[in-house]
């Protein structure tokens, strides 16, 4: 039983370490990448170009999974979109 708990704990830890971050990637202006009126698969392409594992359109902005630490992720606390 202890081995099973240890095994499951290791799997969860691997998922956290390898899984990467998720969120709305920010563009050069600090804004979310919009997917309003874009083709199907646009966000998945944008996310994989940023070395993420996948992504989808969480209308109206792209949401990515598995992003590396080097990619800026938009947050409401650090929102600089449209501000000078």
Curated annotation (Swiss-Prot):
Record-level GO BP terms: defense response
Protein name in UniProt: Toxin Ts4
Distribution of this protein across tissues and organs: Expressed by the venom gland.
PTM-bearing positions, type Cysteine amide: 81
One Gene Ontology term, aspect cellular component: extracellular region
Family from the record: Belongs to the long (4 C-C) scorpion toxin superfamily. Sodium channel inhibitor family. Alpha subfamily.
One function term, GO molecular function aspect: sodium channel inhibitor activity
Entry keyword Cell membrane: no
SMART domains: Knot1
Entry keyword set: Allergen, Amidation, Disulfide bond, Secreted, Signal
Pfam families: Toxin_3 (PF00537)
Location of the LCN-type CS-alpha/beta domain: 21-82
UniProt domain comment: Has the structural arrangement of an alpha-helix connected to antiparallel beta-sheets by disulfide bonds (CS-alpha/beta).
Propeptide: 82-84
Signal sequence interval, chain numbering: 1-19
Cystine crosslinks: 31-81, 35-57, 43-62, 47-64
Subcellular location: Secreted
Function: Not toxic. Induces an immune response similar to that induced by whole venom. Induces a dose dependent release of the neurotransmitters glutamic acid and gamma aminobutyric acid from rat brain synaptosomes. Thus, polyclonal antibodies raised against this protein can neutralize the effects of the venom.
Domain of life: Eukaryota
